[in-house]
Amino acid sequence: MRCPFCGNVDTQVKDSRPAEDHVAIRRRRFCPACGGRFTTYERVQLRDLVVIKSSGKREDFDRDKLERSIRIAMQKRPVEPDRLDQMISGIVRRLESMGETDIPSATIGEIVMEALARIDTVGYVRFASVYKNFQAADDFDKFVSELRPPTGKDS
């Protein structure tokens, strides 16, 4: 593994352990050339996925991009990082087990929204605001009003 700090190709594994509920291996590495320490994760990839964007453009599925978008939506929310890691791994496993290699971005967005709705409403709304391209406060009002159960009062 190449050192991200100095580019040396001879790094050493100092510690390996299961991560993300035993679906990944976490490795702590050390670079003898510069003394840098870094962590890598090794995961099973069942199949290479391709995302079909709404424009029709195709791009390779990027787990890191998915993780970044979810972590941005969940920033400063009271959810354990391990729980997010498990959720992200579950989303990826679900995508890989769909039987298709080409997956529309809309499908990925809906799966992410389902998962976020189960763990944190605020993160769910934040993600939806980007995914559904909210343009005004009214978009938020409409979306949030659909989340609330009816009060039984006539307006």
UniProtKB/Swiss-Prot annotation:
It holds the Pfam family ATP-cone. The keyword Cytoplasm does not apply. A zinc finger (unnamed) spans 3-34. Its cofactor is Zn(2+). Binds 1 zinc ion. InterPro entries: ATP-cone_dom, NrdR-like_N, RNR_NrdR-like. Belongs to the NrdR family. It comes from the Bacteria. Keywords: ATP-binding, DNA-binding, Metal-binding, Nucleotide-binding, Repressor, Transcription, Transcription regulation, Zinc, Zinc-finger. GO terms for molecular function: ATP binding; DNA binding; zinc ion binding. Negatively regulates transcription of bacterial ribonucleotide reductase nrd genes and operons by binding to NrdR-boxes. This is Transcriptional repressor NrdR. One of its GO terms (biological process) is negative regulation of DNA-templated transcription. Residues 49-139 form the ATP-cone domain. The lineage of its organism: Bacteria, Pseudomonadati, Pseudomonadota, Alphaproteobacteria, Rhodobacterales.
